[in-house]
Amino acid sequence: MDAMRQSTPRAMLLLCAVLMLAVAPPGAATAAAVAGCECGNAAAAAVAGEDARGALRLKLVAIASILAAGAAGVLVPVLGRSFAALRPDGDVFFAVKAFAAGVILATGMVHILPAAFDALASPCGGGRGGGGGFPFAGLVAMAAAMATMMIDSVAAGYYRRSHFKKPRPVDDPADAARAAGVEEGGAEHAGHVHVHTHATHGHAHGHVHSHGHGHGHSHGSAPAAATSPEDASVAETIRHRVVSQVLELGILVHSVIIGVSLGASLRPSSIRPLVGALSFHQFFEGIGLGGCIVQANFKAKATVIMATFFSLTAPVGIALGIAISSSYSKHSSTALVVEGVFNSAAAGILIYMSLVDLLAADFNNPKLQTNTKLQLAVYLALFLGAGMMSLLAIWA
């Protein structure tokens, strides 16, 4: 009985407390929780602000580092023309080009194309390109490779036609020498070479006449075919110019994308490893592009313009990413689709250029095929370039 009397006041107090909680205003019950959330939000905002400032510092470092690395890479072959070992017809240049081709091939196959598949297969991007859907990334890469082949062929044909339609000198020293040989062999008539260029047959005929002067006649409306060593050299230079311009187009598209992606990132932990990886990436790609520019024999102005465009594209992309970082979301549907399509196109261009215009042209060169030591050195350089660029995929 006494125990019941002692417990009654406690029960009454507990009941009063429950009733007070029940009738208390909703704000009073959550005031402490709201205060805690405000403190948590303030701390999170402070951390986010510190991350943003650290990320901005790293982005500025990345702009300077990538700019310097790209410029150094593209200038190595260009300035290397002053050294006999690095001239376009030297053995060392074959190895440098093979290394650069391996870098470009790995860039397309290991870096860009998988990223394109991931972007187009992402659920945020609508699930295009992977899973049970259609592989749009592969389709775009294939279309870009075929378009590159068409541009390569059409542009080279146009430049050849425009070059060989130009007026040609009539009295060629080689023809004059051959004519002199005929005269020394017992020709009865003395004089100069009378040249008839037959476009339909694609060759020139030298006839010795008794006239005391030379004549040049051109028959037909089509240009003469490139049969002389000089014409073959011009055709090869035209091919190298087209290759270098199309290759730079593919590299520029890719450089803008990776620059914007890095510039829009807000986490220092994700930017820090990219600075070094992308610097090496731009350096190796610059070597490949610089080698093509050297072989194309561009004038100094065109060389400077192409080197400048390559060097500035990725840093400009980073600056653009910084400018739009507040509104840009790389995980949005639009961003993923655009990035996936452009990455696929860039991958198709670079894969085609590395295999067809760089590797196939050099590995079918008689100078390489008749030199076993040079062949082994070039293969080693190719595998080294592709391997080193593939290794960078761990960080970038």
Swiss-Prot record:
Topological domains annotated Extracellular: 31-59, 113-130, 267-273, 325-335
Positions with biased composition (Basic residues): 203-218
Entries under Pfam families matching the protein: Zip
Broad class of where this protein is predominantly found: membrane
TM regions (residue ranges): 60-80, 92-112, 131-151, 246-266, 274-294, 304-324, 336-356, 376-396
Annotated function: Zinc transporter that mediates zinc uptake from the rhizosphere and may be responsible for the translocation of zinc within the plant.
One cellular-component annotation, GO: plasma membrane
Tissue: Expressed in phloem cells of roots and shoots.
PANTHER family linked: ZINC TRANSPORTER 4, ZINC/IRON TRANSPORTER
Note: Plants overexpressing ZIP4 show decreased zinc concentration in shoots and seeds, and increased concentration in roots.
UniProt protein name: Zinc transporter 4
Region named Disordered: 203-230
GO molecular function: zinc ion transmembrane transporter activity
Composition bias, Low complexity: 219-228
Residues of the signal peptide: 1-30
